[in-house]
């Protein structure tokens, strides 16, 4: 972690969760400070169908809510899409943009991700901008060049430490149980900090860099001890309060 940066533990429920799942949110909200301490932030990005209810449940807790995607436009004939303003209207404070599953399933390019980040800012949301290399790119030794290209294309010039969070998610590690080595994560996050510094100047010094990719209670302590890893973007492990809080505990006192 970076000593001067307040860590963020973010959960991404993806396409999981119905009303019966809301009890897990209550447990996360009530247990977060005890687990992570008062010096960390938490957010759960739920499906749009749960967002308003999740926001009500977490309203008096230190855990915020977020969306998982937004359309660049404020409104219009975009059936099935959700504007950032609509997420904010449901109580969201954050929104994930550019997740690898969106890039793959919906063929989103870097410029699409940048437009969504700007839409998030317009609505007063913090954008969690996701980047990361595929297995083929990794095996070809292209990890750092891919990250440079995605920082250049996916992070708009107006990004600040307040309106943006960067999440590094090696695509090959998501949902597979595989994680890069400590050395690989450290190298990637140091590279991201340097690239952001060249693009954004001093703002990059305070920007939170999250690691995402099969984060679980058993590896959270090691991952969150790495310099420039300022929190985590958690997938499956965020669906259960016990797992999310166990991961959150890894930042306590750091």
Swiss-Prot record:
One of its GO terms (molecular function) is triose-phosphate isomerase activity. The active site is at residues 99, 169. Keywords: Cytoplasm, Gluconeogenesis, Glycolysis, Isomerase. Its main location: cytoplasm. It comes from the Bacteria. It is found in: Cytoplasm. The keyword rRNA-binding does not apply. One of its GO terms (cellular component) is cytosol. One of its GO terms (biological process) is glycolytic process. The keyword Isomerase applies. Pathway: Carbohydrate biosynthesis; gluconeogenesis; Carbohydrate degradation; glycolysis; D-glyceraldehyde 3-phosphate from glycerone phosphate: step 1/1. Substrate binds at residues 12-14, 175, 214, 235-236. Its EC number is 5.3.1.1. PANTHER family: TRIOSEPHOSPHATE ISOMERASE (PTHR21139:SF42). Involved in the gluconeogenesis. Catalyzes stereospecifically the conversion of dihydroxyacetone phosphate (DHAP) to D-glyceraldehyde-3-phosphate (G3P). Belongs to the triosephosphate isomerase family. HAMAP family: TIM_B. Homodimer. This is Triosephosphate isomerase. It comes from Chelativorans sp. (strain BNC1). The lineage of its organism: Bacteria, Pseudomonadati, Pseudomonadota, Alphaproteobacteria, Hyphomicrobiales.
